[in-house]
Amino acid sequence: MIKSILLSVDGSAYTDTVLRYGIHCSKACDALLRVLTVIDVRIFEWAVAAGADGFVPILPSAVFQEESRRMLDERASAVLDKCRNILQTEKCKFELHKISGPPVDVICEQALTVDLVIIGARGEFARWESKMIGATIEAVTRLCNKSMLIVDKEFTTPSKILMAYDGSPNANRALSITGFMAKKLNIPITVLTITDQAEHGRNVLREAERYLGPYEVGIDTAIASGAADEAIVGYAEIHNFDIIAMGAYGHSRIREAILGSNTEQIIRKSKVPVLLAK
């Protein structure tokens, strides 16, 4: 099911973790790693636009633009060189790709040819983003049509998965990749549903158990109540789960615009990787 994995790297503190999770998944699934770094052309476009539209128009010189492009290209090459050394040492199958363009567009386009995307929760400007998820990752999680593993700065060998399940179509799609990953990584799954209605919760959990049965992995179930994002992240933290798996963006866009989405909140608050199923 997972034979190729896209690793989005930018040289930030998250790059090493993206590589480590990629290596772990690649070895478990015998999957090819496609390592991608993007030279962000928006930097040049912003510089020109800001200069032209300013109160006192000042356009950056051609020399400045050329030197900036050269520096970014060299940095991207250095990132890929370091990735190459690590992956060769780990004896993984891999490809390296350096592409210029808007990061969101490039990542989503490259994701069309893989089964899974692994990306850091924040990028090279993380120090200024506080606890908010990066603008690039937020857009990619919405626009990318492939499942994603969103990781933080620390790598932990996965030992158990918390699967958030509510019986919705999006959550149901997450069962497949969660079962597959648990089987390949040889780790158990706990299926968690958030509801104040115990009988409904038990019915939802029975459905998940029945689906996951053929994967022949350890399965446990749990019911919690409260705000979904807080309950899921809190349960994962209290019980020391290493991955949270869930369907992506289950609410209407109108509701998300007003209240925010559970998906975004869980990515922001979680201290462990989040597996988003598409």
Residue ranges and their predicted role:
Residues R69, D73-D81, L175, R202-R206:
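Short, surface-exposed alpha-helical segments at coil->helix boundaries
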Residues S12, S100-P103, S168, G226-A228:
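Short beta->alpha connector loops
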Residues T15-K27, L96, P102-E154, Y235-K278:
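Gly/Ser-rich helix-loop-strand patches that form or flank binding pockets
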Residues V79-F94, Y215:
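A structural motif corresponding to the C-terminal end of an alpha-helix
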